[in-house]
Amino acid sequence: MKKVNLIQKFQLFNEHWSPKVVGELNGQQVKLGKFKGPFIWHHHENEDEMFYVVKGSFTMELRDGNIELNEGDFLIVPKGVEHRPNAAEETWVMMFEPATTLNTGNVENELTKKELDII
């Protein structure tokens, strides 16, 4: 068992939209990501996702409206719900989701990360 400092982990990388794995439990992964600008519209067929804002704020765009998330807020996006994170400024986000979750869900493009770094 070891303690993890999220701030120190976030300081290890600069890329946006490139999640890093910082922990695993029961088939789930704890991931960190830096968001900036709009991501892509996508959904996940089999996985729910949790987004927790560590620093900054972002909008989770949904087809039926937007949800603003600020530091300290979290949101669970159920499987099958199309969504697009969009951050006006760099935002630090912790995600909790099954290890099988592909960051771009049902879409594969230049933002798709099939192999995630463990930090």
Region spans (language model):
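Short, conserved beta-strand element in jelly-roll/cupin
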Residues: K34-F35, H44-L62
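Short, surface-exposed charged micro-motifs
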Residues: V21, M50, T59, N66, ...
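Short beta-strand His + acidic residue motifs that chelate non-heme Fe in jelly-roll/DSBH
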Residues: M60-E61, V77, E82-A88, V93-M95
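A cytosolic small-molecule/anion-sensing beta-strand core signal
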Residues: N26, V54-K55, N70-E71, E89
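Short, charged/polar surface micro-motifs in flexible loops or helix N-caps
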Residues: G27-Q29, K36-P38, K55-T59, N66, ...
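A short glycine-rich, His/Asp/Glu-containing loop-to-beta-strand
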Residues: L6-W41, E47, G105
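Double-stranded beta-helix
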Residues: K2-F10, G23, A88-I119
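Short acidic-glycine-tyrosine-enriched beta hairpin
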Residues: R63-K79
